[in-house]
C-alpha cells in the first residue's frame, strides 16, 4: 500500500508532507515529497518479484493533504458500547476492540476495577485466553474481517488503593498491598498486567512492595491520598507511573503539593491525564504540561461502558452510574465515574479546547503510551519496521480513515 500526499507525523514529532509505504502489516518506507520518486523507484527495484511490484502499486491512497499519524494507544479505559473489560467475557473484549479500532485506537490496555481477588483473577485469565486466541486469528485474518485494536496489556487500577480516594471504586474490595496476591495477578494474566496501582500511604510495607515488584510490573500511584513526602518516597523506590493525574488523589496546593508535586519532581514518572473536558479544567491541563515535560504525559480516555451509547443508567465496577451528555457520575453521590469519551476525542479536545499543540497531543496518545507499555519498538510512531497502524485526519482532526495492520 502507498499512502501518498499526506502530512506524515515523523518520529521527531513534526509533520512533513510526503507518504508512507506498507507491505503486509509493516511500514517499509516513509518519504518526503522531495524524495518520493527516488523512494518509489528504490522500492520497485528491491521487490523480489513482479507480483510484489504489482501489489505495491495496486493500492494507492491519495491522502489529499490529510494528517497521517500513528494509531492511538489507550492504556487506561474500562469499556464502551455497553461492554466492560471486567465483564470477564471474551466476546465483550472483542466488541470493545472492534469499537476502539473504529475510532482510531489501534492498541489497548484496558483497566480493571477494585473487585474481589478471585474475580480479578478470573478476569485476567479470560484476557490472557483472548490474547492467545487473537494471535491465532491474526494468522488467518482476511480483508473482510472487522478491524480490532491489538490487546497489548492490562492496567490494574485496584485493589491496593485508598478508601478515602476510592472515587467510583467499591470500598468493600479494597485491600493493602500484598506481594503474594500481586504475583497471582501477574500469573493469572500470563504477565499481561503492565501496571499495578497502589496507594502507598495505605500499606506499611509499600516501599518494600514496590522494590520487590518493580522489575516484574510497572508500579503506579492510583486512587491515593498520599502526601508529597509519601508519594516522593514511593517514586524514588521504583514506582514510575501516576494514574489519571489530579483525579482521585491529594489536591495540589502551594503548601501541600501532594502526588502531583511529587510526580512533577520525579523525572522518571509518567503521568496519565484525562482531557475529556469534564475531569480537569483546561488551565490545569496546560499547567501540568508546563510542570512536567510533554514526554512524560500520557493521554487516556478512562472510558466506561456507556461510551458510544445513549444517556441512561449503567454500571462500573458493580456500582450504578448515571450518564447525561458527556458526564458519568455515581448514582449514590455524584462522584465522577470514568468518562464517556474515547481517546481520539480526548486528543482532539486537548488541541481544540485546551491549547495543546497538535504535535504534542499526538505524542501523548501514541509515542508516550507505547514507551510506558514497553512496546515502542513495534508501534507508536510512523517508522520503518513498525506496525502499519495509521490514521488519516482532516484539518479539523476528524478521523477519515483507519489503516490497521496495513489494511
Residue spans for each PLM region:
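N-terminal metal-binding scaffold of metallo-dependent hydrolase/deaminase domains
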Residues: 1-39, 45, 49-50, 403
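Alpha-helical scaffold segments that flank or form the walls of functional sites
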Residues: 67, 75, 85-150, 172-189, ...
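Divalent metal-dependent hydrolysis catalytic cores, especially in the metallo-beta-lactamase
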Residues: 78, 94-126, 148-162, 189-203, ...
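Active-site loop-to-helix "anion-binding N-cap" substructures in soluble metabolic enzymes
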Residues: 79-88, 109-119, 248-265
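Active-site gating loops and adjacent loop-to-helix segments of metal-dependent hydrolytic enzymes
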Residues: 98-109, 163-190, 233-235, 239-245, ...
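Active-site core of metal-dependent hydrolases
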Residues: 187-309
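His/Asp/Glu-enriched, well-ordered alpha-helical/loop segment
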Residues: 261-271, 289-301, 307-393
Amino acid at each position: 500500500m502507498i499512502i501518498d500526499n499526506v502530512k506524515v507525523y515523523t518520529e521527531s514529532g513534526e509533520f512533513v508532507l510526503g507518504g508512507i509505504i506498507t507491505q503486509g502489516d509493516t511500514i517499509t518506507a516513509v518519504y518526503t515529497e522531495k524524495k518520493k520518486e527516488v523512494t518509489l523507484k528504490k522500492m520497485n527495484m528491491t521487490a523480489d518479484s513482479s507480483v510484489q511490484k504489482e501489489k505495491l502499486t495496486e493500492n494507492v491512497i491519495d491522502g489529499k493533504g490529510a494528517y497521517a499519524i500513528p494509531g492511538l494507544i489507550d492504556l487506561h479505559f474500562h469499556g464502551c458500547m455497553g461492554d466492560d473489560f471486567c465483564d470477564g467475557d471474551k466476546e465483550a473484549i472483542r466488541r470493545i476492540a472492534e469499537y476502539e479500532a473504529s475510532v482510531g485506537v489501534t492498541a489497548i490496555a484496558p483497566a480493571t476495577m477494585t473487585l474481589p481477588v478471585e474475580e480479578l483473577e478470573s478476569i485476567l485469565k479470560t484476557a490472557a485466553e483472548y490474547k492467545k486466541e487473537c494471535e491465532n486469528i491474526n494468522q488467518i485474518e482476511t480483508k473482510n474481517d472487522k478491524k480490532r485494536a491489538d490487546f497489548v496489556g492490562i492496567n490494574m487500577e485496584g485493589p491496593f488503593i485508598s478508601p478515602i480516594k476510592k472515587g467510583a471504586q467499591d470500598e468493600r474490595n479494597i485491600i493493602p498491598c500484598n506481594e503474594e496476591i500481586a504475583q497471582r495477578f501477574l500469573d493469572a494474566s500470563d504477565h499481561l498486567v503492565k501496571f499495578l496501582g497502589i496507594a502507598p500511604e495505605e500499606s506499611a510495607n509499600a516501599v518494600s512492595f514496590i522494590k520487590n515488584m518493580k522489575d516484574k510490573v510497572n508500579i503506579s500511584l492510583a486512587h491515593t491520598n498520599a502526601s508529597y513526602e509519601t508519594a516522593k518516597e514511593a517514586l524514588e523506590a521504583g514506582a514510575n507511573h501516576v494514574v489519571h493525574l489530579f483525579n482521585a488523589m491529594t489536591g495540589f496546593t502551594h503548601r501541600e503539593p501532594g502526588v502531583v508535586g511529587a510526580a512533577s519532581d520525579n523525572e522518571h514518572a509518567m503521568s496519565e491525564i484525562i482531557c475529556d473536558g469534564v475531569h480537569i479544567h483546561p488551565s490545569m491541563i496546560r499547567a501540568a504540561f508546563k510542570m512536567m515535560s510533554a514526554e512524560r504525559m500520557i493521554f487516556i480516555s478512562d472510558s466506561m461502558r456507556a461510551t458510544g451509547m445513549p444517556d441512561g443508567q449503567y454500571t462500573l465496577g458493580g456500582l450504578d452510574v448515571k450518564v447525561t451528555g458527556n458526564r458519568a457520575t455515581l448514582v449514590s453521590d455524584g462522584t465522577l465515574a470514568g468518562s464517556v469519551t474515547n481517546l481520539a476525542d480526548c486528543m482532539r479536545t486537548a488541541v481544540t479546547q485546551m491549547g495543546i499543540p497538535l504535535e504534542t497531543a499526538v505524542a501523548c496518545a501514541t509515542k508516550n503510551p507505547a514507551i510506558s507499555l514497553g512496546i515502542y519498538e513495534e508501534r507508536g510512531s510512523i517508522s520503518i519496521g513498525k506496525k502499519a497502524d495509521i490514521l488519516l485526519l482532516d484539518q479539523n482532526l476528524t478521523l477519515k480513515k483507519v489503516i490497521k495492520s496495513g489494511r
